[in-house]
């Protein structure tokens, strides 16, 4: 009987997501519930500052991604991540300056970031699963630790944004 190694990618993603969810909910949020939403959302935004790191995916041979995905897909991943990095910088800048319309930037960050995750899940993850034995350790670690952190941070930011805009309507 052959073992399906490809299933280790989604399984590791699930474990990573659950782990980050527990960490954030039990350690971070428990201690900072009294903060205003504009301040509480900032650490979640900070997670996205470093998404520009996917520029390194464009360097041939640095990871195994070039053996798995076509160049245009790698370019798409990189551009979405760089856009999220820039949007997180703008979000933090305007939130720090207490600009009246600052919360629009976290909204844009979440729209772009969640769209990136959706497209990657639909088109790229199946390729990673099918080619799991060619993934290098760095790429596997990103897929199973950093991407779950990004996903969990988006879920918390969406919840905070929902609460923020609902409170503004009342």
Predicted regions and their residues:
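A glycine-rich, hydrophobic loop/mini-helix early in the fold
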Residues: 11-72
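C-terminal transmembrane-bundle signature of multipass membrane proteins
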Residues: 117-127, 137-168
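Membrane-proximal helix-loop-helix units in multi-pass membrane proteins
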Residues: 54-106
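C-terminal ends of transmembrane alpha-helices
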Residues: 53-65, 115-133
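Hydrophobic alpha-helical membrane segments
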Residues: 80, 84-88, 105-125, 146-150
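Non-cytosolic membrane-interface motifs at loop->transmembrane helix junctions
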Residues: 3-5, 67-79, 105-106, 130-143
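Hydrophobic cores of alpha-helical transmembrane segments in multi-pass inner/ER membrane proteins
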Residues: 11-24, 83-91, 144-160
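Membrane-interface helix-boundary motifs at transmembrane edges
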Residues: 27-41, 94-104, 165-170
């Amino acid at each position: 009987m052959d073992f399906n190694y490809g299933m280790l990618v989604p399984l590791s993603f699930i474990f990573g997501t659950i782990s980050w969810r527990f960490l954030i909910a039990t350690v971070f949020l428990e201690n900072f519930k009294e903060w205003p939403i504009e301040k509480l959302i900032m650490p979640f935004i900070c997670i996205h500052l470093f998404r520009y790191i996917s520029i390194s995916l464009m360097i041939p041979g640095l990871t195994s991604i070039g053996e798995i995905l076509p160049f245009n897909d790698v370019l798409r991943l990189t551009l979405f991540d760089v856009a999220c990095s820039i949007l997180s910088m703008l979000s933090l800048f305007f939130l720090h300056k207490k600009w009246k319309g600052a919360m629009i930037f976290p909204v844009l960050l979440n729209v772009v970031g969640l769209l990136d995750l959706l497209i990657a899940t639909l088109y790229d993850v199946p390729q990673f699963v099918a080619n799991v034995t060619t993934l290098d350790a760095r790429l596997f670690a990103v897929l199973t630790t950093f991407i779950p952190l990004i996903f969990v941070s988006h879920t918390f930011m969406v919840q905070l944004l929902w609460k923020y805009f609902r409170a503004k309507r009342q």
